[in-house]
Amino acid sequence: MATVHLPIRQLVEFLLRTGSIDSRFTGFDRALEGAHIHRKLQKAAGDGYQAEVFLSVERQAEDITFTLEGRADGIFTDETGTVVIDEIKTTAVPPEEITEDMNPCHWAQGMVYGAIYAAQQSLPELNVRLTYYQIDTDQIIRFIRRFTQQELDEFLDKLLCQYAPWAQRRIEWDVKRTQSLAALQFPFAQYRPGQRAMAGEIYRACRAGKTADCKGGTRLFCQAPTGIGKTMSALFPALKAMGEGNGEKLFYLTARNTTQTAAEDALTRLHTAQPELALRSVTLTAKEKVCLHPDAEGHPACLPELCPYANGYYDRIKDALTALLDGTGSFDRAALAGAAKRFSVCPFELGLDLSEWCDVVIGDYNYLFDPVVHLKRFFDSSGEWLFLVDEAHNLPDRARAMYSARFCKSSLTEAKRALGKGKSALKTALTKADKALLEARKACIQLAPRHSSQTDAADPAQTSLLPENTAPALELPEPLYAQDSTVFLQEPPSALLSPLRAVQAPLQDWLEANPDAEVHAQLLELYFAVQDIARAAERYDSHFVTQLTARGRELELQLLCLDPAPFVDASLAAGRSAALFSATLAPPSFYRSVLGCSDARAVALDSPFPAENLGLYCLPNISTRYRDREASVQAVSDACLLYTSPS
C-alpha cells in the first residue's frame, strides 16, 4: 500500500479553501507574524495549557496510507473536565465581521487534530475551540463546538477520501519520475574536465543526507572554475540521487535571473536528450515582476474588487492544477503567465501552488533564506529537500541584507506632508515617531559631533539643532563607537522602536481605506519600511548591531546583521543536503564560518584551462567605477576587441 506524507494544514486548505486572494486580510503582517501572537496567548493561558502539541497518525483511505502530521496550537482540560483543542488564528477582519462560520478551514484543522488526539487518548468526546485574535483592537473572540470521537473520525475519513484522487496522482507521478530519473543519462557525449569530479561530490552529498554527525543535513562547498558547466554538474547528480530515493524535491537557488535561466536551459537539455523524461519544474519569480493586473503605480493590487486574477482564485485553482499536471511541464515565467491568463488565476500564487507538485523549484535565494518570504509550505518544517545554491559567494552579503533593516526619518516627515492638513490617528502616530527620531538625531550629534576639519562641519542643519542650553530628550546608551555623527549601539533604543511600531496599525487602516489615493504607493513603502524594522527588532540578538547616522536633517536607523551564520544554518537544516558552489569560494574557512556550515566538506577543483592561455592586461586610463561605467562602455568594448582579435 502506497504511503503519502501530508501536513494537516495542507490537507484542509487544499480541499476547503474558497474565495479570493485579499491582501487586506493576508498580505500585511502588523502583528509581526502570527507565531508572536500565538506565543502571547499560549503564555497567558496558564500552566495547564499545552502549547504547540505535535500530533501524527497513519490513516488508510482508498488503499492509500496517509501519514498526517501537524501541531495543535493548544490542548487543555477545562473546568468541567473536558479536553479542548484550541486553534488560534490572528486576523485583520473587523471584529463585527468575525463569525463562527467565517472560515471552514479553521474548524477543519481543529477537528482533524481532535480526531487524532481523541483516538490516541481514547476520549469519547472533546471540544474544539477557535480563538480569533483581532490584531487592530487586540480583541479575542472565541467559539466552541463539542464533537464525539465518531463524528471526528467520520469527518477525517471524508477529507481523506476527497483527497485520495490527488494523492493517487502524486503516487503515480512519483513512480514514473523515479523510474525516469533512474534511467537518466548525462546529456553530453562526455564530461568536460572537472565536471565528473564536481558531479561526484554533489551526488555523494545528496545520498548522505542527514546523519548522526550531520543532523542538519550534509553540506558541501564546491569551488569550480568558470566554464566547466557547473549548472549541469550540479543538477544531473542531484536528480540521479532523487531517482534512487535520496530526496523528494530539488530547490535550485540563485542570486540572479541569468543563473535561473541557466538552470532552465539545463533542464531543457535533459528533456531534449531524453524526451520521455518525467520531470516537472517551476521557476518562481517576484510578484511585482509577474503581476498581470498592477495598479496605476505598477504595484500588484491583490484585492478581489480590483484584480480579476485574485477574485475567486481559490475557487478555480484546482481546475487549473488538474489541467496543468496532466503532462510533464516546465513552468517558467512565460508559461505561468500563459496558464494564469487561461484559467484566470494569479500567476504568482499559481507558481507557489504548482511548486508542491513539481520536482524542481528554481528561484531566488530569498525563497529559502529570507525570514519574510521563504516558502513556509516547505520550510516551516524539515523535509527531504535537496538544495543547490548557485553563485554561493553572493550569499553572505545577501543573507546579511535579508536579516538587516534600514529606516530613514525623512520618510515620516514626507508622509505627514503627503497626508495634508487635518487630524487623524495616523498623523498623530507619525508625529510621535518623527519626534522620537528627531530626539535621537540630536543625541547622535551630541555623542558624535562632526570633526571641525571636515568640509561639511559647519552644516547649519547640524549646528543649529543643539543650542548651548539644550540637551536632547532621548538619552542613548553607551555606544560601541561614536564619531562623525555616526553611533553604533549594542542594542536598538526602545524609545525609537516603540513609536515606530505604533505607526503600523493606523497606517494599515489608512492603506486599506484609501486604495486609490494618489499617495498610496508612498505610504505603502513607508509601511513596509516600518515593518522591516519591527521584524528585525524581533529577531535582534548578539549577531546584530545598531547604527544611527545623522546627516543634515536626516537620521538613518539601521539594525545590521553582522553574522548571518545561525540563520543560514537553520534554513539549510530544513533540507536533506545542501551543495553551495561558485567559481570563487576562497578561503573556504571564511564561507563555512559565515554561512553556518563549520563542519561542511569543502573542495576546490583545479582549472582545466592551460595557464599559458591567461592574458592579464592593465588599462589604467579606463575607469570601471560604477558612476563611470556608462561612459566607459565603448572604451572597454574597443579594448576587448583589440586584445582578442587575431594579430
Spell out what each predicted region is.
Residues 341-356, 372-378, 510-623, 632-636:
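A contiguous, basic/glycine-rich beta-loop/short-helix subdomain that forms a polymer-engagement track
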Residues 178, 185, 246-361, 369, ...:
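A substrate-engagement module of RecA-like helicase motors
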Residues 176-221:
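Conserved pre-motif I regulatory segment
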Residues 1-78, 82, 108:
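Metal-dependent nuclease catalytic cores that hydrolyze phosphodiester bonds in DNA/RNA
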Residues 232-245:
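Walker A/P-loop NTP-binding motif
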